[in-house]
């Protein structure tokens, strides 16, 4: 969360903010609505000169000397985008807010973009048992992540976006029972 990162308030820091889902004006509006009174105690957008907010294509072009970034549409109510970031022959795929199995074309495109990547960050909000009652909610299961990891031949799988009610103890236990030893 942007305002809970103390580095945001240091004027010597510069932040580049972009989204494949929203244009520059929409990003500014979203940040202003989320992080100003009454939802947040102060308006972080007011006089915040260390935010460089740009459209995705502008960001992609500006970053080319450091890394390449590709976007992919994901399955989530209201829309969602995933990303593949590559640099120095290494790549990471970020695929949160995605409901695996809802749209085979999107799943196949995601599999293609993640193929042989170094890391896949996966939406593991639910278990296969829990997800049965949550069709259309825009999230995946931990088990789907393991299956996707095998198919993509990615080197590592990071499960993220866990159900908020899970404790660290729950996650440790789930890791031991649901993930192959090679992924722990």
Model region roles, listed by residue range:
Residues 1-93, 101-104, 110-111, 168-184:
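Binuclear metal-dependent hydrolase catalytic cores
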Residues 75, 96, 160:
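Single, functionally critical "micro-switch" positions that shape active/binding sites
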Residues 99-183:
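Cap/insert and terminal regions of metallo-dependent hydrolase folds
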């Amino acid at each position: 969360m942007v305002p809970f990162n103390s580095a945001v308030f240091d004027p010597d820091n510069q932040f580049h903010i972009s989204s494949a889902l929203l244009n520059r004006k929409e990003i500014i509006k979203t940040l202003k609505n989320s992080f100003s009174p009454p939802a947040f105690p102060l308006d972080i957008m007011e006089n915040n000169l260390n935010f460089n907010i740009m459209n995705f294509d502008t960001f992609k072009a500006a970053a080319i000397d450091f890394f390449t970034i590709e976007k992919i549409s994901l399955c989530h109510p209201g829309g969602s985008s995933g990303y593949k970031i590559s640099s120095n022959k290494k790549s990471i795929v970020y695929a949160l807010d995605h409901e695996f199995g809802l749209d085979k074309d999107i799943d196949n495109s995601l599999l293609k973009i993640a193929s042989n990547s170094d890391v896949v960050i996966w939406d593991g909000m639910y278990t296969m048992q829990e997800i049965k009652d949550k069709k259309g909610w825009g999230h995946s299961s931990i088990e789907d992540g393991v299956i996707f990891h095998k198919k993509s031949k990615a080197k590592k799988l990071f499960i993220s976006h866990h159900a908020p009610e899970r404790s660290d103890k729950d996650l440790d236990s789930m890791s031991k029972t649901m993930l192959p030893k090679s992924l722990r």
